[in-house]
Swiss-Prot record:
This is Phosphate-specific transport system accessory protein PhoU. One of its GO terms (molecular function) is protein homodimerization activity. Its main location: cytoplasm. Belongs to the PhoU family.
């Protein structure tokens, strides 16, 4: 995290506080990544015990989000950070909200798997497992980019979401074909479509975290910007830290 310039602060305690919440974010991110990986495995393998552990573990993710948010509030109230320090605290608060929502997706996947899926649905789950692994890799990579505030890696990950969208669209077409060929599959296909959409949204959450990295490094709000306009903004000079 050299790019965060934590050593510039006169207050060693302020350094420690910033480093602490950054470390907590990475811990929470690792927890969410494991939850998501376990959820995809539980769904694909119809592992009810693993699914139950993921559901139980979601409360730990929620508790961590609250604890980090409270730490951010304390820093703002006590230190009154400015410029890049304030951006960092804001980015951390927004990032943990995205991570918590990804944790919710893992929870929902497991609940759905327990209630709706059985071994007879295995053909429907193969493509969902592939999409899930794709988004897990995106999450892993964006957490790594966040740790280093690596804008080049964030740009690559941001663009990776297009591939996730394409994979999702292919799954939708495949599932619709199942429904048209056999109307008895309609309930299970609708459930699979719900899961596919939930997994696809993880890619969007990772994109949001990329935007937070852009904001921290560049000092500009990149939300709702895409294509050529995004390229132009990212090509600009880095903001003053």
């Amino acid at each position: 995290m050299d790019s965060l310039n934590l050593n510039k602060h006169i207050s060693g305690q302020f350094n420690a506080e910033l480093e602490s919440i950054r470390t907590q974010v990475m811990t929470m991110g690792g927890m969410v990544e494991q939850q998501l990986s376990d959820a995809i495995t539980a769904m694909h393998n119809q592992d009810s015990d693993l699914a139950k552990r993921v559901i139980e573990g979601d409360k730990n993710v929620n508790m961590m989000e609250v604890a980090i948010d409270e730490a951010c509030v304390r820093i703002i109230a006590k230190r009154q950070p400015t410029a890049s320090d304030l951006r960092l605290v804001m980015v951390i608060s927004k990032t943990i909200a995205e991570l918590e929502r990804i944790g919710d997706v893992a929870d929902k996947i497991c609940r759905t798997a327990l209630e709706k899926f059985s071994q007879q649905h295995q053909p429907l789950l193969v493509s969902l497992e592939s999409l899930g692994r794709h988004t897990i890799q995106m999450l892993h990579d964006v957490l790594d980019a966040f740790a280093r505030m690596d804008i080049d890696e964030a740009v690559r990950i941001y663009r990776e979401d297009k591939k996730v969208d394409q994979e999702y669209e292919g799954i939708v077409r495949q599932l619709m074909t199942y429904m048209m060929e056999d109307s008895r599959t309609i309930p299970s296909v609708l459930t699979a479509l719900f899961c596919a959409r939930s997994i696809e949204r993880i890619g969007d959450r990772c994109q949001n975290i990329c935007e937070f990295i852009f904001y921290y490094v560049k000092g500009q709000d990149f939300r709702h910007v895409g294509g050529d306009e995004l390229d132009k903004l990212l090509a600009g000079k880095d903001s003053d830290k």
